[in-house]
């Protein structure tokens, strides 16, 4: 018997009783073998050979061998069955004689044991299948699993018992939870804290995680975009309704001290050329929010740190110089470290103040958690009450530190000389932003001003002592009533853009969870609230009075008390359940929470001439711990929630730079560009070469990044190359243009109507063409050009000329006037200069370039026809023949770049062939080459098919159209109905292009995406 048969036989015999021995066959020519129950021995007879065969044997049983006829009752016998070659008896071809007599008691006892074993085997279930699963496949039905009557009648009773047993087991299983479930239930806060070690969660994280694609950025876990299709819906919300965003990840730096000392310390970090500073009158009084760009001390216009917004706390006694002032500076988390260090150096704050923050105990390790969850003396299935530590219990801090700060490091610094105190208030407040015309209606419906406590009310047991003390002062009550009246007026104003930009309103409100509606509703403006036209007109013209900007949110002690004494959702729900009339208003009286908030108006789009005020709204500042208490009421009033993607779209439609990607002269912007290029390169390499564009053949040198430094350097060297010859040709300064056609060293673009083979040959080797051009320029200029280059390098070294972005409002207004087309009948073919503005002359251009030799200009581009720009799209200068074709046919889309040759393809193919040869070699020969043969292979691994390898050539002259700049944001604009883009161009190249273009077509450029050869016309504009 084989092993498989032995295992099968053992499986069949496992339920047999131990006192029963069943014979499995007889061995021939053996001795006496007793049958169970019999006492007479019997002998196995030898088989006689069957006549006619030599291998077959037949067993013969003699019926006359039984002497007693009473023994005809056979207790056991062997059946005859047919095998190959004849009939055989038993498994081994043997037979046994029937015993002469048996003992009835012994025989019955053996049979009873067999019957009991058989019944036991029948009643005990050996498989895990249910009754309906034992049926043949053709009899099974899907409804049998939940409908017993679908089974055959003989099996319905058994199936009913199985169903009842399953329900009973399910109820018992719910009590016996696994260790993981019990640990998660007991230590959920600790688990959340552990998951926030690297990336901090906002208070609305759980809500976002269920509905948004989450990303880990800047030390936080933030919602990037909704999981549903909502691009157009979010735009409609920003335009006609309301969009809600959580900006609590923004950082806040607080400066305390004398006003004179603070302004003196911060004056070197900003410049009045870029706009308002910290000393602006409306901002200094605390009436408006200001915005500016910070630089390193006395480094303007270079070494920019980033854009910030700021708020001054209003003075109690205006004009008192001895009063201590508070200043809040809000900034993006990527800018925090650089700006904080520079402010500390400017204010001379070097001494850290001892931190008063309660630092939580270290998070338990998995082994410690396991030891905590062990239950040695308790039954697992029982419900257990948590043991209370009583007075020794330590509260678990839900949020430790913030995403940009180590909780163990100090967060306050003081200056011994100036007395200024700098505090890091990041994650100490929540900041929500409502965008859209319905922001007023949603605010006035979701938030109600706090009720004033009267003398007769029982206020002894209330935890809000600060509000009780406030209500005892008539001046404070009067101020609160004025703030409430102004807040109610907002409900009737149709758009936040009607209010002065940056208006601030302080307010103390009640718990918004009490006014929560039964179901979601859409908030609409209420014109009845604007019946007092005089007050509304005064509010729209002058804004909120200075005294109404006061808010208790500036007091950290009050904010801490408000956070600690917040009524939990569980207690509120319990109070609602105890109401006599379900669904009625819950009135808490003096025990209701009072929350100080600050409302800040966001002006939206403030540059340009079209869609002014689009995207305006309100920012709401709240104490920490109250995020979800305000978030849910806003949701119930019909807002749509957006993430980081919606923030980028909002800034794109406002045509304002987005932080940090649109600040190339900022350290955070440079880091962002490096990370973005790395991610795009990895994504590009994941695709096979046949399924990705070959950027070398498309003439795209940098498809994943924007080489700003090389762009500005190339344009600076181009101007310096023909500046001296142009001056020599016109010593009296009669020439007023920087036309490229008049410069001998300036390259002329190739004509698009030339045969394709000639054009392809002309740019087949771009490096050779550049070398020939440079050699020609050197021959024409001679030693004078070299001297000029050395002088310019000395000038750059002396002035510290680095890459910068032009942010002077005066110069931007001048450039904006020059970019637009002008009529032909104006004097000299130029646009008539405005008041205080110069014309587009050579002297004006040189004076600008003298101060900003390597500068970029923020521009907006609008396509004339079809096309949708994308990031890293190239902005190029059109040629003369492009204008001619556009003048003949206004439907002309633009020229097309001819394909370039790929000089790296042969190197990559040789590299692959070399690798194949090395694989085919024997292992001994391959290893004998040693590390000397691996060095060139390692150097060649940097080559990627489709990308330019090594240092980039001159980016401005690589293609048939001169490169001017790059696009950083671009897409189809639903506001305009065509493609729009935002980006930077070289200031030198822009002036050169404007001075050489016809007056009627000034400001036209060409856009070409990285993966396309088609140029498309667009109009450039500078909005100030």
From Swiss-Prot:
Listed Basic and acidic residues bias regions: 387-399
Modified residues (Phosphoserine): 367, 584, 729-730
Basic residues compositional bias, start-end: 1-14, 911-923
Listed GO biological process terms: tRNA 5'-leader removal; tRNA decay; tRNA processing
First-listed, main subcellular location of the protein, grouped into a coarse class: nucleus
Superkingdom of this protein's organism: Eukaryota
Pfam families referenced in this protein's UniProt entry, alphabetically: POP1_C, POP1_N, POPLD
InterPro entries: Pop1, POP1_C, Pop1_N, POPLD_dom
Record key words, sorted: Disease variant, Dwarfism, Nucleus, Phosphoprotein, RNA-binding, tRNA processing
Annotated localization: Nucleus, Nucleolus
Assigned GO CC terms: extracellular space; multimeric ribonuclease P complex; nucleolar ribonuclease P complex; nucleolus; nucleoplasm; ribonuclease MRP complex
Residue segments, region Disordered: 1-95, 365-399, 722-762, 773-792, 819-838, 911-936
Disease: Anauxetic dysplasia 2: An autosomal recessive spondyloepimetaphyseal dysplasia characterized by severe short stature of prenatal onset, very short adult height (less than 1 meter), hypodontia, midface hypoplasia, and mild intellectual disability.
Record's subunit section: Component of nuclear RNase P and RNase MRP ribonucleoproteins. RNase P consists of a catalytic RNA moiety and 10 different protein chains; POP1, POP4, POP5, POP7, RPP14, RPP21, RPP25, RPP30, RPP38 and RPP40. Within the RNase P complex, POP1, POP7 and RPP25 form the 'finger' subcomplex, POP5, RPP14, RPP40 and homodimeric RPP30 form the 'palm' subcomplex, and RPP21, POP4 and RPP38 form the 'wrist' subcomplex. All subunits of the RNase P complex interact with the catalytic RNA. Several subunits of RNase P are also part of the RNase MRP complex.
Main function: Component of ribonuclease P, a ribonucleoprotein complex that generates mature tRNA molecules by cleaving their 5'-ends. Also a component of the MRP ribonuclease complex, which cleaves pre-rRNA sequences.
Alphabetical list of PANTHER family matching this protein: RIBONUCLEASES P/MRP PROTEIN SUBUNIT POP1, RIBONUCLEASES P_MRP PROTEIN SUBUNIT POP1
The protein, known as: Ribonucleases P/MRP protein subunit POP1
Native source species: Homo sapiens (Human)
């Amino acid at each position: 018997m084989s092993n498989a048969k032995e295992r099968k036989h053992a499986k069949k015999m496992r339920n047999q009783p131990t006192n029963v021995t069943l014979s499995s066959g007889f061995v021939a020519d053996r001795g006496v073998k007793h049958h169970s129950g019999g006492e007479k021995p019997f002998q196995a007879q030898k088989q006689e050979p069957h006549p006619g065969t030599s291998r077959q044997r037949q067993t013969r049983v003699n019926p006359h061998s039984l002497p007693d006829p009473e023994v005809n009752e056979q207790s056991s016998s062997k059946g005859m069955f047919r095998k190959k070659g004849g009939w055989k008896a038993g498994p081994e071809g043997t037979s046994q004689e029937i015993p002469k007599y048996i003992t009835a008691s012994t025989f019955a006892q053996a049979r009873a044991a067999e019957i009991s074993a058989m019944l036991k085997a029948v009643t005990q279930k050996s498989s895990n299948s249910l009754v309906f699963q034992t049926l043949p496949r053709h009899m099974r039905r899907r409804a049998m699993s939940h409908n017993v009557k679908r089974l055959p009648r003989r099996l319905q009773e058994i199936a009913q018992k199985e169903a009842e047993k399953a329900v009973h087991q399910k109820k018992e299983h719910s009590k016996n939870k696994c260790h993981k479930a019990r640990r998660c239930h007991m230590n959920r806060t600790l688990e959340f804290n552990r998951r926030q070690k690297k990336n901090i969660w906002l208070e609305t994280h759980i809500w976002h995680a269920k509905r948004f694609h989450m990303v880990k950025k800047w030390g936080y876990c933030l919602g990037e975009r909704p999981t549903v299709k909502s691009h157009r819906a979010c735009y409609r919300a920003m335009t006609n309704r309301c969009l809600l965003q959580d900006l609590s990840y923004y950082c806040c730096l607080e400066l305390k001290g004398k006003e004179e000392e603070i302004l003196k310390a911060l004056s070197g970090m900003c410049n009045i050329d870029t706009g308002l500073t910290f000393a602006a009158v409306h901002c200094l009084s605390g009436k408006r929010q200001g915005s500016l760009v910070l630089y390193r001390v006395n480094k303007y216009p270079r070494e920019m740190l980033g854009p910030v917004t700021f708020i001054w706390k209003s003075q109690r006694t205006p004009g008192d110089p001895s009063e201590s002032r508070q200043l809040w500076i809000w900034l993006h988390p990527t800018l925090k470290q650089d700006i904080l260090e520079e402010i500390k150096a400017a204010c001379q704050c070097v001494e850290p103040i001892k931190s008063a923050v309660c630092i939580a105990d270290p998070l338990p390790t998995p082994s410690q958690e396991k030891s905590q969850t062990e239950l040695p003396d308790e039954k697992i299935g029982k419900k257990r009450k948590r043991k209370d530590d009583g007075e020794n219990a330590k509260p678990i801090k839900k949020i430790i530190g913030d995403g940009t700060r180590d909780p163990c490091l100090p967060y306050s610094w003081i200056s011994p000389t100036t007395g200024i105190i700098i505090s890091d208030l990041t994650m100490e407040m929540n900041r929500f932003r409502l965008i859209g015309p319905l922001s007023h209606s949603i605010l006035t419906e979701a938030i109600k001003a706090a009720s004033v406590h009267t003398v007769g009310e029982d206020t002894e047991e209330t935890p809000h002592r600060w509000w009780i003390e406030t209500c005892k002062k008539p001046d404070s009550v009067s101020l609160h009533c004025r703030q409430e009246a102004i807040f109610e007026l907002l409900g009737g104003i149709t758009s936040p853009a009607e209010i002065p930009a940056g208006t601030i309103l302080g307010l103390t409100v009640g718990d918004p969870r009490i006014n929560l509606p039964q179901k979601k509703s859409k908030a609409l403006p209420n014109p009845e609230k604007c019946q007092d036209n005089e007050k509304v007109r005064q509010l729209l013209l002058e804004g909120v009075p200075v005294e109404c900007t006061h808010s208790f949110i500036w007091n950290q002690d009050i904010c801490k008390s408000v956070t600690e004494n917040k009524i939990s959702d569980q207690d509120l729900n319990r109070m609602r359940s105890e109401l006599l009339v379900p669904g009625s208003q819950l009135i808490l009286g003096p025990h209701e929470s009072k929350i100080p908030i600050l409302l800040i108006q966001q002006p939206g789009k403030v540059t340009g001439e079209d869609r002014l005020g689009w995207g305006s709204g309100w920012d709401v500042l709240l104490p920490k711990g109250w995020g979800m208490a305000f978030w849910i009421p806003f949701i119930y009033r019909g807002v749509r929630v957006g993430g980081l993607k919606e923030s980028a779209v909002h800034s794109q439609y406002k045509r304002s730079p987005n932080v940090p990607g649109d600040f190339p002269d900022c350290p955070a912007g440079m880091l962002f560009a490096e990370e973005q290029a790395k991610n795009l390169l990895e994504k590009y390499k994941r695709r096979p070469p046949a399924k990705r564009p070959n950027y070398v053949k498309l003439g795209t040198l940098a498809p994943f990044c924007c080489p700003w430094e090389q762009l500005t350097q190339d344009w600076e060297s181009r101007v310096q190359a023909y500046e001296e010859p142009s001056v020599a040709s016109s010593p009296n300064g009669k020439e007023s243009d920087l036309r490229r056609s008049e410069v001998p060293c300036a390259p002329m673009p190739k004509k698009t109507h030339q045969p394709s083979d000639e054009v392809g040959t002309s740019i087949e080797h771009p490096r050779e063409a550049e070398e020939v051009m440079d050699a020609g320029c050197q021959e024409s200029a001679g030693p004078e050009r070299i001297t000029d280059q050395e002088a310019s390098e000395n000038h750059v070294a002396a002035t510290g000329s680095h890459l910068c972005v032009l942010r002077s409002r005066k110069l931007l207004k001048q450039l904006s006037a020059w970019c637009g087309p002008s009529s032909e009948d104006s004097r000299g073919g130029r646009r008539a200069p405005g008041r205080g503005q110069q014309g587009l002359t050579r002297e004006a251009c040189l004076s600008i370039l003298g101060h900003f030799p390597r500068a970029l200009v923020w521009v907006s581009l609008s396509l004339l026809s079809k096309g949708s720009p994308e990031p890293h799209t190239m902005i190029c200068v059109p040629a003369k023949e492009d204008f001619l074709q556009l003048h003949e046919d206004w439907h002309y889309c633009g020229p097309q770049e001819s394909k370039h040759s790929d000089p790296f393809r042969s190197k990559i193919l040789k590299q692959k062939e070399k690798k194949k040869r090395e694989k085919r070699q024997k292992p001994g020969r391959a290893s004998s080459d040693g590390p000397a043969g691996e060095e060139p292979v390692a150097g060649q691994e940097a080559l990627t098919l489709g990308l330019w390898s090594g240092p980039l050539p001159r980016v401005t002259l690589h293609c048939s159209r001169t490169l001017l700049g790059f696009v950083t944001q671009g897409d189809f604009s639903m506001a305009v109905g065509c493609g729009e883009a935002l980006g930077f161009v070289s200031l030198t190249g822009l002036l050169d292009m404007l001075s050489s273009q016809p007056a009627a077509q000034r400001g036209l450029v060409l856009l070409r995406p990285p993966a396309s050869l088609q140029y498309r016309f667009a109009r450039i504009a500078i909005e100030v």
